[in-house]
Amino acid sequence: MSFKKIIFIFFLIFSNSVFADDKMVLGLEVYNNKAQCGTCHTLHAAGSVGNIGPNLDQLKPQIPQIIAAVTNGIGMMPAWEGILTYEEIEAVAYYVFNSTKK
């Protein structure tokens, strides 16, 4: 394998890792501060113990499910479309999914 290929592969792996870390940080920020999801939801990774909405640690929702719920609202949960950007909705979905998949 050529040196250029090794460098290229290393760059791809490293850049994806940095992007994922940024998405987790933004997701946590949205969860805890901008949308204050922990007011209603329990999520151990975020230190939240809400008891109105589903316990996300137990539910273990998938990313598309989270995006749909946050965007459109569900049950008592309000829709966040127009309040959060799509990037923020995607980041909070990524954060919740990765925090509960263990």
What role is predicted for each listed range?
Residues G50-K102:
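Extracytoplasmic electron-transfer domains, predominantly the class I c-type cytochrome c fold
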Residues A46-G47:
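Short, non-ligating residues that shape and space the ligands of small metal-coordination modules
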Residues M1-V25, A69-V70, I83, Y95-K102:
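Post-cleavage N-terminal segment of exported redox proteins
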Residues F11, G38, P61-P64:
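Amphipathic, positively biased hydrophobic alpha-helical segments used for protein targeting
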Residues D22-L43, Q58, N72:
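Sequence/structural segment immediately N-terminal to covalent heme-attachment motifs in c-type
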